[in-house]
Swiss-Prot record:
Record bears the keyword Cell membrane: no
Annotated stretches, region: Disordered: 416-466
Function: Structural protein that plays a role in the packaging of nucleocapsids and in their egress from the nucleus toward the cell periphery.
InterPro entries linked to this entry: Nucleo_P80/P87
GO CC, alphabetical: host cell nucleus; viral capsid; virion component
Molecular function via GO: DNA binding; protein homodimerization activity
Organism, as annotated: Autographa californica nuclear polyhedrosis virus
The keyword DNA-binding appears for this protein: yes
Pfam assignment, any one: Nucleo_P87
Name of protein: Capsid-associated protein VP80
């Protein structure tokens, strides 16, 4: 009985001190051990808690740490891992607290990260002979955090001791809370009015404005008005007096080759710039600095990396650019369209505060323009939307695009649409009616001044209803106008091109079993031979989105010969729904198709191959449907009923594919020329200039 009590007491003590319940239970339940052996084993576990560590564990798992440390207990492994994880959490906390992540703390944070990186690399090498080296790295990191903590406490104490400063801080907190509430209210109102936005012209234009909107709950850009005016003013003054200095800069700059000191100084300067100048630097520079920081932490070869900093920011970051250019390929250049799009692609939250039309255009740019070889497309937008852009980087993007291909700016107050920096207009454009010219033929609306608006709310309501109706009429006319412009080409030729190009792909039919059905997913078994054939070519010319509107627009130019017989209209509408459901189903099961198709590989460009099969299967089916109506005579204007259905389904298809994340690939080996696939790929991208 006494021995049983001793075992229970020893078991309880071992569970409390070692905190390893599972191991203690295994020892107690082991029937091969006697009672005394169990007590001795548990006692040794308790005594091992205070034993000195012989080697450090890996930082990724406590179980793995205990297995790789020689003659050590799990308690020691837990201690190392706990200290490491606490420091990692501390770094994340400080970086996400912008009020205290300033020039001083940025340097300390960089030192902590440098010590943790050295510690992790040292542990993963598997050399455990010098335990003092491990402990010294963690101690250095902990000392830096103690300094940060002391700075926090001093700033809090200073505020608490100064009554006026404390009141100002409380007022700033109140302003931040009010701003947050106001932003939430605006988002709720925007969500409530989402149905009205669908009926507006800028939401229905099926060219530049056809991309889906990000959800209202998407994070807003942190550089905008989420912080109080007091904090923003402080950040502005800090940026004006910024000094690009570091205590070890001279020693690092005089180094003959890249070493750990140069790396540490560069990381400190980068963190300092990102923490202090986030409102002043161009987004391209910020994006490049983040990539540079990640590259430095990866310890890759210095000769394989290059960055492009904005030439204006290089003046501010003189020391950083000079030191980096000594060991890396660093260039100070003017922003280009491709570099700006890459930066916005990585910081898409920048576009959140902008208007709906601007967001759609920017998102479409980031999705479709991959590099300098990608052809640009025509963009039309209201001049008022351009003038209302809040973020300077977004406005710079439009300016860069306009320099390459003039944007068609629609002036709501003038008599004709205007192009920025270009006064040329074709004679064909002069013959087309504009939204503003149609507005000029309508009776004018009396504009109520702000004083009258306050005096008479009833008049305001009446005028608002009139204005809303007027805008809807204008939008409908403008939508018809854009559709008419798009239908200038003879639709018979477009359908004929689909038939000719797809019939010419007999070599591809030999490698697959094309079911010509949109009711099911393309099967990997039916396309296995085709996938192996496609792997020989570079397929990066395939657009990773679906130009649903452009592909099916030719169908909108057909009407029923007899108004009483709606058979043809029903067939066209049903086919549009069938095609949209097919693409939605493919987008929903894209990951599944990727896995099943890759069984025949593996393939480096699997995502492009899946998209090729999705579009190829669709073109096979549309070829058969086009033959049914190819002999009919099309109209010069679209059937608005069918056109409205197409616009609606286009938005749904775009939304389905915009939520996908695709894998890029780098194909360095030589690939075959895709010349005989060029026409088919152009047709997949809705480019009818194939013949």
């Amino acid at each position: 009985m006494n021995d049983s009590n001793s075992l229970l007491i020893t078991r309880l003590a071992a569970q409390i001190l070692s905190r390893n319940m599972q191991t203690v239970d295994v020892i107690v339940d082991d029937k091969t051990l006697s009672l005394e052996e169990k007590i001795d084993t548990l006692t040794s576990m308790v005594l091992a808690v205070n034993s000195p560590p012989q080697s450090p564990p890996r930082v990724t798992s406590s179980d793995l740490a205990a297995s790789i440390i020689k003659n050590n207990s799990k308690m020691v492994g837990n201690d190392f891992e706990m200290r490491y994880n606490v420091l990692r959490m501390a770094v994340v906390f400080v970086k996400h607290y912008p009020k205290y992540y300033n020039e001083t703390t940025a340097g300390l944070v960089a030192e902590i990260e440098s010590n943790l990186l050295q510690y992790q690399n040292y542990v993963n090498q598997g050399n455990y002979q010098n335990i003092e080296g491990y402990d010294s790295l963690l101690n250095k990191a902990e000392e830096c955090y103690v300094k940060i903590d002391r700075l926090f406490k001093e700033s809090i104490k200073k505020i608490m001791d100064d009554t006026e400063a404390f009141e100002r801080e409380q007022e700033a907190e109140r302003l931040r809370a009010e701003q947050t509430a106001a932003n939430a209210l605006l988002e709720r109102r925007a969500q409530t009015s989402a149905d009205d936005v669908v009926n507006r012209a800028d939401a229905n234009i099926p060219t530049a404005f056809s991309d889906p909107l990000p959800g209202p709950s998407a994070p807003r850009y942190m550089y905008e008005s989420s912080e109080s005016d007091t904090y923003m003013e402080t950040a502005r003054r800090t940026a004006e007096h910024y000094t690009d200095q570091d205590k070890d800069y001279n020693a690092a700059y005089t180094a003959d080759e890249y070493n750990s000191l140069v790396k540490t100084v560069l990381l400190r300067l980068i963190e300092k710039a990102l923490a202090t100048l986030k409102n002043r630097l161009h987004i391209t520079t910020i994006d490049q600095l983040k990539k540079f920081r990640d590259y430095l932490n990866s310890d890759a070869d210095a000769g394989e990396f290059q960055i492009f900093l904005n030439q204006e920011d290089c003046v501010i970051l003189k020391n950083l650019s000079n030191l980096a250019s000594k060991f890396f390929n660093v260039r100070c250049v003017a922003d280009t369209l491709e570099v700006m799009l890459e930066a916005l692609r990585n910081n898409i939250e920048l576009v959140q505060p902008e208007s709906d039309a601007v967001r759609r255009i920017v998102i479409k740019m980031t999705q479709e323009i991959k590099d300098s070889s990608t052809p640009l497309y025509n963009i039309a937008m209201y001049k008022s939307d351009y003038d209302a852009i809040k973020n300077k980087n977004i406005k710079t993007l439009f300016d860069l695009y306009n320099d390459r291909l003039p944007i068609n700016f629609l002036d709501t107050s003038a008599t004709s649409p205007v192009r920025k920096t270009s006064g040329k207009r074709s004679a064909e454009d002069d013959l087309l009616p504009t939204r503003s010219s149609k507005r000029a033929n309508r009776p004018e609306i009396n504009v109520i001044s702000s004083e009258d608006e306050q005096e008479d709310d009833d008049v305001e309501d009446v005028d608002y209803e009139k204005e809303s109706k007027r805008r809807k009429l204008e939008d409908e006319d403008f939508l018809k106008l854009k559709a008419l412009e798009f239908s200038k080409d003879i639709v018979n030729e477009k359908l004929q091109k689909i038939i000719v190009v797809t019939d010419g792909m007999k070599r591809l039919y030999e490698y697959c079993n094309c079911k010509n059905s949109l009711e099911t997913l393309p099967s990997a078994a039916n396309y296995g031979s085709l996938l192996k054939r496609l792997n020989l070519y570079n397929l990066d010319h395939i657009e990773m989105n679906v130009n649903f509107y452009e592909l099916l627009f030719p169908l909108t130019l057909y009407n029923d010969n007899d108004n009483s017989d709606k058979t043809l209209s029903h067939q066209l509408v049903n086919y549009i729904f069938l095609a949209s459901n097919y693409f939605q189903n493919c987008a929903k099961n894209f990951n599944y198709m990727r896995e099943t198709f890759n069984v025949f590989g593996p393939f480096k460009q699997i995502d492009f191959m899946v998209m090729f099969v999705i579009k190829f299967n669709f073109l096979c089916d549309m070829r058969n449907f086009a033959k049914l109506i190819d002999e009919l005579v099309p109209n010069k204007q679209p059937n608005m009923r069918i056109h409205s259905v197409l616009v609606m389904r286009d938005k749904i298809v775009k939304l389905a594919f915009s939520n996908l994340q695709f894998q890029t690939f780098s194909k360095k080996d030589k690939s075959r020329n895709t010349k005989h696939l060029q026409r088919l790929i152009m047709l997949m991208n809705a480019n009818y200039n194939v013949i």
